[in-house]
């Protein structure tokens, strides 16, 4: 997860009339940092994108253009999951529980990956048109209905 500065998680359970259980998890987090890579092996160490072990260089002709690790920052993330359930007793300890779950209730797009490669081997100082574009997002809204047998 690297150096994610802020993370807030709240969970709760409410037992409604009729033994219906309603629970939720709310997660809000600041954006995760990521490394910006040059896209070329600038110092000949076999590791494309780094100028030294702790730096990436955007312009190979300039020492002043090196940037530190975790310079890029993803957008913040927010997610709400809910669950509604009720247990029905069949006999003795045996029962069945009906479940209805919604993940990512508000269908928010939470980006998890970004194109962090700035340039190419031929032109490491010229930004790629895809630099900084998001390449992957967390799962969209999902609904799940289930039955669980307990004994």
What are these model-predicted stretches?
Residues 1-151:
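Short, solvent-exposed micro-motifs at the edges of structured domains
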């Amino acid at each position: 997860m690297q150096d994610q500065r802020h993370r807030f998680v709240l969970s709760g359970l409410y037992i409604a009339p009729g033994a219906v259980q309603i629970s939720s998890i709310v997660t809000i987090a600041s954006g995760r940092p990521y490394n910006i890579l040059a896209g070329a092996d600038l110092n000949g160490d076999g590791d494309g994108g780094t100028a030294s072990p702790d730096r990436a260089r955007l312009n190979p002709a300039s020492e002043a253009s090196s940037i530190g690790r975790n310079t890029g920052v993803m957008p913040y993330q927010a997610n709400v999951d809910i669950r509604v359930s009720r247990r029905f007793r069949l006999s003795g300890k045996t029962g069945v529980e009906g479940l209805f779950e919604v993940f990512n209730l508000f269908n928010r797009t939470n980006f998890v990956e970004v194109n962090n490669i700035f340039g190419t081997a031929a032109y490491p100082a010229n930004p790629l048109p895809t630099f900084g574009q998001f390449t992957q997002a967390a799962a969209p809204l999902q609904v799940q209905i289930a039955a669980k047998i307990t004994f």
